Amino acid sequence: MYGMQYIQQTIVGIDGSEARFFGYVADNSEEMEPDRIRPAILILPGGGYAMTSDREAEPVALQFLAKGFAVFVLRYSVQPSRYPVALLEAAEAMRLIRANADQWHVNPAQVAVLGFSAGGHLAANLATSVGDEDIREQGGMDPDAVRPNALMLSYPVITAGKYAHLSLIHISE
């Protein structure tokens, strides 16, 4: 029978916080492409690291699902959690997607991350070497194994210097 898998998991942060991981994965139909392997997208909603926006989560996920993607949304930990909690949760979400690629009919070499605002900041950190040491040492993961194959940034918080969004970047002390 043709349908959809709805995936819900909790990712526990290094500070004990709980991120929510959701997935929308269409089942393969025996009538239509029974062996179809889909590209995947991990969506990281924005919200200034104070919340994760509803409008940048499921509504966006459903649009990509309709285009044939396996789609995942991470409601990562926000305040009072501090860096690198959300980064490690995003890395774990990428690990989960690739570890379950066969079951979820996902091409592990075609996993993109889409981040909005603060989620764009998080996505950029995951995609570059910025957080590699934290991913390796605190997350116990190989940064290259959890790095996305493609990146989409929607009004990301990545400005440095004079116009930086310093109030949004919460670093552990």
Q: Which role does the model predict for each range below?
A:
Residues M1-R36:
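N-terminal cap/lid segment of alpha/beta-hydrolase-fold proteins
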Residues I37-G46:
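Short beta-strand element of the alpha/beta-hydrolase
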Residues G48-A50, V71:
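Serine-hydrolase catalytic-loop signature spanning alpha/beta hydrolases and amidase-signature enzymes
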Residues T52-D54, L74-P108:
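Catalytic nucleophile-loop/oxyanion-hole region of alpha/beta-hydrolase
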Residues R55-F72:
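Short amphipathic alpha-helix adjacent to the substrate-entry channel of hydrolases
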Residues F69, Y76-V78, P156:
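Active-site loop/turn elements of alpha/beta-hydrolase fold enzymes
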Residues R95-L166:
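Primarily recognizes the serine-hydrolase "nucleophile elbow" in alpha/beta-hydrolase
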Residues I169-E173:
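Conserved small/polar residues in nucleotide/adenosyl-binding loops
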